Amino acid sequence: MTVKTALRQGYDLLAEAGLAEPRLTAEVLLLHALHRERIYLYSHPEHELSTLEWLHYGRYLHERLKGRPTQHITRVQEFYGRPFRVSPATLIPRPETEHLVEQALQTAGGARTLLDIGTGTGALAITLALELRARAVATDLSFDALQVARHNAAALAAPVDFVQCDLASALTGPFDLVVSNPPYIPAAEMATLQPEVRDYEPHLALLGGEQGTEIYHRIVPQAERLLTPGGWLIFEIGYQGEAGVRGAFAHGPWQEVSLTCDLAGLPRVLRGRYTP
Ligand SMILES: C[S@@+](CC[C@H](N)C(=O)[O-])C[C@H]1O[C@@H](n2cnc3c(N)ncnc32)[C@H](O)[C@@H]1O
């Protein structure tokens, strides 16, 4: 069995099962079995798979066909050009969340200290700490997620401290920038999620209460306690979350509250400036 034939067979199986991106998935799973970089698939199409490589590739395809996310099989997802370990305890970082990074770099490029609330893999805290050359603190309720985030920070040499607590309740600050991509799926929508999300990703990372915006109303007052005057609070929001999250900013000392949409044109990032 050559690389070329293995790719074709993997593609056929995944495409027949109706899975998204069958070619890319077959490539990623085969590379994982071969322990190679992507270029190898095209520079060595006649490479004969060893028995072990073939067995591993077959097992990965089988797991994917049963619904397991590719990133849970390879245990890695790229975010803003860097590899992040993922686990069943962490949300798989999404490309849409890179929009928050871009907005934070544009809006708060001078931040020296930042806080990421609900850090998961650490994707936001680590990326922003490295891009801004800032010191970061990141929180999560999940001990297992924080273990993964700590691993990622060490692997990427990012200056991030991790704290297990409810939102930012254990912290004193001050911070120049607070970011958060909290759970924001309304309870009624959980059943409608793709099975690969609903059945494999942690509900602690997904479920945002009845409306999906309640957690933002808890974060905003905490940010008021922690931000330096003039500092920014920047949220990722769900596609229906804008009005509810704007409401969270409405009664406090917030100015320059504004929304940006992602590449798909969906409301994605809402920010406000703490102006006491
Ligand atoms: C949507 S995920 C975002 C993860 C990561 N920031 C990202 O963008 O990929 C939300 C994260 O918030 C954490 N979380 C949920 N409720 C929390 C709470 N009350 N306090 C702290 N973290 C919480 C979850 O464990 C999860 O890691």
Protein language model regions, located:
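Conserved AdoMet
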Residues: L30-Q106
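Conserved RecA-like P-loop NTPase ATPase core
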Residues: L29, A153, N181, V197, ...
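Conserved SAM/SAH cofactor-binding pocket of Class I
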Residues: I92-T192, R218
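Conserved beta-strand segments of alpha/beta enzyme cores
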Residues: P83, R135, P159-D161, Q255-S258
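Conserved Class I SAM-dependent methyltransferase catalytic core
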Residues: E210-R273
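Mobile active-site "lid"/loop adjacent to the S-adenosyl-L-methionine
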Residues: Y184-I215
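A general structural signal for well-ordered alpha-helical segments in protein cores
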Residues: L7, A26-E27, W54-G58, T70, ...
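Non-catalytic accessory regions of SAM-dependent methyltransferases
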Residues: M1-Y42, E46-L49
